[in-house]
């Protein structure tokens, strides 16, 4: 059992270093099972899973940030946030400097020629690991058929890797389970704050704000909208 979210030298808490290592090992094992020579993910939660990198909500729509994981290699992160690339490298020492600004792409790509910089960058990384052909898994690729065509022209075969990552994430280690328990406890605390504040005349938006405030105070990166409904708004769908 882990004790809270704060690390201490006298209490066993969530071991994030162990969790990062476990997640990377799970991904590599599933890549091996599925015969993948590389996996590229644009999925924010799989970027988090493989590289422990956070894709802010405001930058997700364009799907320009991604991670490349070659067979037998390490994660390579292409990202942009409020941090500079240099600051991101300092913020995430476990990536050992393998952090770069994301090239233009994602949902903005509609033709193969627009992937030229992306392909040059990714194929260069794969070549460093001796991968110049083989099977590449694309996870949550924003323009799948365009990128598939680009990789085929470069001598690779392509598959959808969504199921590979689903299977990798489906078995949690003790640290991930501790995170799930803590998230549930935070949700309980948020609803308790709402319950304490309910009284005649209070606005629904005020109750929603109290719930979100509680979650952020307890360390949430982001929150889903609370559905606070009363009166005629409570009719079931």
Question: What do the predicted segments below correspond to?
Answer:
Residues 30-50, 132, 143, 185-237:
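Active-site cores enriched in adjacent His and Asp/Glu residues with nearby glycine-rich loops
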Residues 1-186:
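A composition/biophysics-driven feature that prefers long, compositionally simple stretches
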